[in-house]
């Protein structure tokens, strides 16, 4: 049978010891794997349970979610291919095969590709930038971060066309695109991230509800813009937007398809 155990949110040393103990108790000789994924765990729970059932108690998966990031701790008997099934099932969701944050993985890929990053944030208000510069050595690959919160800052600092904001609004595909384009045109960067949206609790409408977010990620070759409506309070919407933006940048740097249709995040 499969056993479900709630682990602590940071998988601290006591939790690792507990995890190892459970592995010996339940499985005897076993392997431990960590998989980092992007997406709500509710969307994945049934498929994870199916993987556990397929191995008749030879594999156990412990999930923990923070925002849109899910950490899977996989225990399985030595030689059991359960973790391979996890990779196959959630390939588009996985961003790391070790316990590493989105921002850290993003910087690692910038280093490997020898690329520089610039960020323009509206609703996220510096959350992406702050998270990135928590990492030592970020200055080697992180060039610039702007909080362009007002319409005038978007037009003055990023060269967003005032007519675009007038016709489509600050929260739109078009504005997000121009924000990223402004970074690429004016900044010293190879890849750009831009966010604009309605964090709430006020400011929403029928056509543009609270939680509506546009995220642009691009290079000099192409800019992709993604639309999402994130649920939750103001902080949760901002966190989800920040995490999604970094995940998209990771996918772009890894040359993965940016078709997001198969990944549910809200």
Name each model feature, range by range.
Residues 65-69:
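Short Gly/Ser/Thr- and Asp/Glu-enriched loop/turn motifs at secondary-structure junctions
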Residues 56-62, 190-194:
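A short linear hydrophobic-aromatic micro-motif
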Residues 38-60:
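Short amphipathic alpha-helix segments
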Residues 4, 17, 50-51, 79-266:
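Short alpha-helical segments enriched in small residues
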Residues 25-43:
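Short glycine-/aliphatic-rich beta-strand segments at the starts of folded cytosolic domains
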Residues 1-25:
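Proline/glycine-rich low-complexity loops and linkers
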Residues 10-13, 41-43, 122-128:
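Gly/Ser/Thr-rich loops at beta-strand to alpha-helix junctions
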Residues 36-39, 72-78:
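Short beta-strand-to-loop capping motifs
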């Amino acid at each position: 049978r499969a056993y479900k155990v709630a682990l602590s949110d940071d998988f601290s040393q006591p939790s690792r010891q507990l995890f190892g103990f459970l592995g010996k108790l339940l499985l005897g000789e076993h392997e431990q794997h960590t998989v980092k994924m992007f997406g709500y765990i509710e969307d994945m729970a049934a498929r994870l349970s199916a993987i556990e059932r397929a191995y008749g108690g030879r594999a156990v998966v412990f999930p923990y979610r923070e925002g849109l990031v899910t950490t899977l701790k996989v225990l399985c008997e030595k030689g059991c291919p359960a973790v391979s099934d996890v990779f196959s099932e959630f390939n588009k969701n996985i961003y790391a095969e070790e316990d590493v944050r989105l921002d850290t993985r993003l910087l690692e890929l910038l280093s490997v590709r020898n690329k520089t990053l610039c960020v323009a944030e509206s609703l996220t208000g510096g959350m992406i930038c702050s998270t990135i510069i928590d990492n030592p050595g970020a200055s080697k690959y992180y060039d610039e971060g702007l909080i362009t919160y007002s319409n005038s800052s978007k037009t003055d600092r990023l060269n967003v066309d005032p007519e675009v904001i007038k016709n489509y609004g600050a929260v739109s595909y078009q504005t997000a695109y121009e924000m990223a384009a402004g970074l690429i045109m004016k900044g010293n960067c190879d890849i750009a991230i831009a966010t604009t949206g309605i964090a709430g609790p006020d400011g929403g409408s029928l056509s543009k509800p609270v939680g509506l977010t546009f995220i642009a990620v691009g290079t000099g070759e192409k800019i992709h813009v993604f639309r999402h409506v994130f649920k939750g309070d103001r902080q949760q919407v901002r966190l989800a937007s920040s995490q999604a933006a970094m995940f998209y940048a990771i996918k772009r740097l890894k040359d993965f398809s940016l078709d997001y249709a198969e990944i549910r995040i809200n």
